[in-house]
């Protein structure tokens, strides 16, 4: 194993000193209030060893990173029937684009763009009241993170609801094709709330361990999903996890990952570690600017890219 402690601390120190931090998300008012100077990085391996740097224990809004876990949960509920409602291809379009959805008859291109994640949320909601579905998602997050203190930031959820007109348009358009089956307000309510879950880098890195270890969560002591399903979720993270910046992330970092407009990125080094980085300043595609740079530095120093050293 490389000397992860010194690597992580070196990267955190370098990121702290960089002036080019990107811009915080402004279209969700609560996220616009976040201090752009924040930076945290955590790496956790299968033996529970932790390397942490910067603001590793500062909670932030996980936003679209939650889509990895709702996809995992929905696949556990309905299996491959999920793929009748959502595709598995990169979109090449902004995460909240409606143009592609119109061309493809209401079927979202993948589960990590907003339309796809709303459709996945609708599957989880089926047969439940919204509060029950949301409770199931939150309990799953607490379980994989091994931390029952994780909660939803209600201010962020309310802020998203007040300004979520594009998401409402996506959901109503999918409803017209019966891709959404529940009342749109119910589905969007659950969606806004799971995106508003607040977690730290340490908690998110712990939550991603089952994806790094073939579906087995080494700290929980048993399997969360099958090895095949973990491999397939990782594949979708690699190809679709960073909106229309997914190809560039694969080129530069070479790890399965999922970003969120709260500035977090969850990345998976299969068989080696789960990684979470947070820096709220975003690039033009809506991904953490310094987060991507930090992960690129990490894989160069560890040789963890899935494509080789």
From Swiss-Prot:
Signal peptide: none
Subunit field text: Homotetramer.
Organism: Methylorubrum extorquens (strain PA1) (Methylobacterium extorquens)
Reaction(s) catalysed by this chain's protein: L-glutamine + H2O = L-glutamate + NH4(+)
Name under which the protein is recorded: Glutaminase
Entry's family note: Belongs to the glutaminase family.
Lineage, highest ranks first: Bacteria, Pseudomonadati, Pseudomonadota, Alphaproteobacteria, Hyphomicrobiales
Record bears the keyword GTP-binding: no
GO biological process: glutamate biosynthetic process; glutamine catabolic process
EC number: 3.5.1.2
Gene that this polypeptide is encoded by: glsA
Annotated binding of substrate, by residue: 64, 114, 160, 167, 191, 243, 261
């Amino acid at each position: 194993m490389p000397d992860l402690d010194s690597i992580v601390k070196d990267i955190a120190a370098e990121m702290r000193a960089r002036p080019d931090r990107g811009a915080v998300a402004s279209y969700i008012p609560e996220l616009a209030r976040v201090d752009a100077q924040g930076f945290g990085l955590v790496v956790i391996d299968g033996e529970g060893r932790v390397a942490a740097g910067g603001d590793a224990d500062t909670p932030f809004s996980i936003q679209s990173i939650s889509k990895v876990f709702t996809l995992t949960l929905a696949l556990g509920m309905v299996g491959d029937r999920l793929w009748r409602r959502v595709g598995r291809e990169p979109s090449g379009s902004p995460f909240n684009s409606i143009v592609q959805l119109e061309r493809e008859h209401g079927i979202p291109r993948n589960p990590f763009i907003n339309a796809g994640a709303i459709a996945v949320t609708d599957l989880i909601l089926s047969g439940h009241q919204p509060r029950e579905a949301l409770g199931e998602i939150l309990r799953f997050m607490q379980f994989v993170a091994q931390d029952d203190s994780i909660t939803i930031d209600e201010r962020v959820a309310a802020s998203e609801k007040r300004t979520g007109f594009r998401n409402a348009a996506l959901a109503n358009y999918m409803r017209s094709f019966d891709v959404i089956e529940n009342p749109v307000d119910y589905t969007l309510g659950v969606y806004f709330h799971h995106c508003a879950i607040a977690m730290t880098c340490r908690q998110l890195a712990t939550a991603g361990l089952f994806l790094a270890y073939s579906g087995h969560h080494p700290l929980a002591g048993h399997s969360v999903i099958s090895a095949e399903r973990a491999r397939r979720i990782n594949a979708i993270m690699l190809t679709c996890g960073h909106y229309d910046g997914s190809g560039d992330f694969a080129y530069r970092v070479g790890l399965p990952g999922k970003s969120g407009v709260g500035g977090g990125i969850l990345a998976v080094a299969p068989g080696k570690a789960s990684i979470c980085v947070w820096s709220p300043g975003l690039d033009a595609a809506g991904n953490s600017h310094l987060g991507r740079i930090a992960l690129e530095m990490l894989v160069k120093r560890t040789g963890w890219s899935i494509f080789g050293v």
